[in-house]
Amino acid sequence: MTVAHGVGPNGVAPPGSSGIQVIIVGLGIAGLVAAIECHYKGHVVVGLERSPGIRVLGSNATKVLQSWNNGEVLRHLVSQSDDVAAMEILDPAGKLYALDSMDGYGMGEGMIIHRGTLVHGLYEHAKSLGIDLRFASAATDYWEDEGQAGVTVNGEQRIAAACVVGADGVHSKTRDYVLGYQIAPQPSGLAAFRACFSANLLAGDPDAQWILEEAGVQDRMRRYITTGGLGLTLSTGKRGQNVIWQVWHRKHEKADESWENVTDARVEDALALLQDWPTYPQVAAVLRHTPSEKLADYKIISRDPLPTWRSRGGRIMVIGDAAHAMSAIAGQGGGQSVEDAATLAICLELAGKSRVNLALHVVERIRYQRTSIIQDSGNAIYSQMRDPDWETIEKDPSMMKFPRPEWLFGYDVHRDVYEQFPYAMRAVQDNTGYRPRNIPSNSKYQVVHDYEKPVAA
């Protein structure tokens, strides 16, 4: 069976030229990137978001954004991102043990950006393309038959398309339909206080100014690590305009699973965890300015890979956190959502209007093993920070660096999917095994640092 060549990794198809209609449920990172990528590949998109309005990417994800509008979208987002040259690794006394470069996340590669800023930028670009985005529109029911799939919006209006893509996050209703049941998260026993607020709130407090010493030039990031899984990451953002911090802890009874839900978290509770640190006066001087409405306490959860991402009828599937919720510590939730979205758009383009079911099956074949391996990375990464042996670390500071495997950070999803689609499609049609090229050689996540930063032209 022949395969269309498509417009290629950097190509843009005429709007609506594929004749494939796609309903996307959820307009977070995965949903908005899927809407934009599908539009660029000639598909007709309707995006649904139950909220009334719009509410950290590695180098593997920014390759996708670089292809939009001659790189202008990425340039704008980078201008709103954080500029961190290296992360300082310290003990609770403030002794510096390692400097971890931001290779894979730094300027010219990936970016460190507040989720709300990123989502807003994606939304503005999608809106500029004229994509049909509908807010206050909850998908309350799902259905499919041999020729189409659809949803009921707000319990009233039925809309149909060639396929439905659920990008509706960790509490996905689309996933419930796909599986036929709800899945429960597996608590890790960890939680994290999380806050981001304007650095202007530090004005007038001389004890807090140390964190802003490089404001206007670049940002700084400090990670304090101690025993028992307790740690603090404290940084500035947008060259000193924002202050961002997280406290990882095990007292998670009041924590919420969502990154965004503001709970009754109190900064006093976070500070109490750090009160025995020699650096407490210094860090408390900054943290105590956190507004209560900017603070959340969320649970670090884990989920096993789903048995499938696709419905029995084959026209409804999940992507992003709905398909493979990542531990926050892995730093790949947004990146893998972007890769899913790009893969979806290309597979629909290459399969064509008459083979939408096949396209969604190929998406799963190309993406499933990669995301499953990354889902399993949280424990390996966290083990670096749990109960550190500072004497050993002082002899070999590299052991505290964040893992940067080449197969993950060096991945070009556009190029890979265009090249691999025929092979993955044949495996689906013949019901044979398929090994994607986007996974490590031993099919396991390992703490390695073999990613090589691209040389500037």
Swiss-Prot record:
Pathway(s) this gene product operates in, as recorded in its UniProt entry: Alkaloid biosynthesis
Binding positions for FAD per the UniProt entry: E49, R115, D321, G334
InterPro entries registered for this protein in UniProt: FAD-bd (IPR002938), FAD-dep_Monooxygenase_BioMet (IPR050493), FAD/NAD-bd_sf (IPR036188)
EC numbers on record: 1.-.-.-
Cofactor: FAD
Keyword Flavoprotein: yes
Reported phenotype of the disruption mutant: Leads to a reduction of meleagrin synthesis. Accumulates roquefortine D and roquefortine C.
Active site (catalytic residues): R194, Y224
Gene Ontology terms, MF aspect: FAD binding; monooxygenase activity
Induction: Expression is decreased in presence of phenylacetic acid (PAA).
Keywords: FAD, Flavoprotein, Monooxygenase, Oxidoreductase
Pfam families per the UniProt record, alphabetical: FAD_binding_3
Documented applications: The indole alkaloid meleagrin was shown to be a good candidate to control c-Met-dependent breast cancer proliferation, migration and invasion.
Function text: FAD-dependent monooxygenase; part of the gene cluster that mediates the biosynthesis of the mycotoxin meleagrin. The first stage is catalyzed by the dipeptide synthase roqA which condenses histidine and tryptophan to produce histidyltryptophanyldiketopiperazine (HTD). HTD is then converted to roquefortine C through two possible pathways. In the first pathway, prenyltransferase roqD transforms HTD to the intermediate roquefortine D, which is in turn converted to roquefortine C by the cytochrome P450 monooxygenase roqR.
Family: Belongs to the paxM FAD-dependent monooxygenase family.
Protein name: FAD-dependent monooxygenase roqM
Gene name per UniProt: roqM
